[in-house]
UniProtKB/Swiss-Prot annotation:
This is Photosystem II reaction center protein X. It comes from the Bacteria. It is a single-pass membrane protein. Its main location: membrane. It is found in: Cellular thylakoid membrane. It comes from Synechococcus elongatus (strain ATCC 33912 / PCC 7942 / FACHB-805) (Anacystis nidulans R2). One of its GO terms (cellular component) is photosystem II. PSII is composed of 1 copy each of membrane proteins PsbA, PsbB, PsbC, PsbD, PsbE, PsbF, PsbH, PsbI, PsbJ, PsbK, PsbL, PsbM, PsbT, PsbX, PsbY, PsbZ, Psb30/Ycf12, peripheral proteins PsbO, CyanoQ (PsbQ), PsbU, PsbV and a large number of cofactors. It forms dimeric complexes. One of its GO terms (biological process) is photosynthesis. The keyword Ribosomal protein does not apply. The chain crosses the membrane at residues 8-28. Involved in the binding and/or turnover of quinones at the Q(B) site of photosystem II (PSII). PSII is a light-driven water plastoquinone oxidoreductase, using light energy to abstract electrons from H(2)O, generating a proton gradient subsequently used for ATP formation. Keywords: Membrane, Photosynthesis, Photosystem II, Thylakoid, Transmembrane, Transmembrane helix.
Length: 39
């Protein structure tokens, strides 16, 4: 694996983590608050 390819893969992984974790937290938070609001 070339250093360029390695850096590209790492940037994809880090970018995915930076996007996925807040999205997951937001979805869990919204689903919890929605549940309370509906009942």
């Amino acid at each position: 694996m070339t250093p360029t390819l390695s850096a590209f893969i790492w940037s994809l992984v880090l970018g995915g983590v930076i996007v996925v974790i807040p999205l997951t937290v937001a979805l869990i938070f919204i689903s919890q608050t929605d549940k309370v609001r509906r009942s």
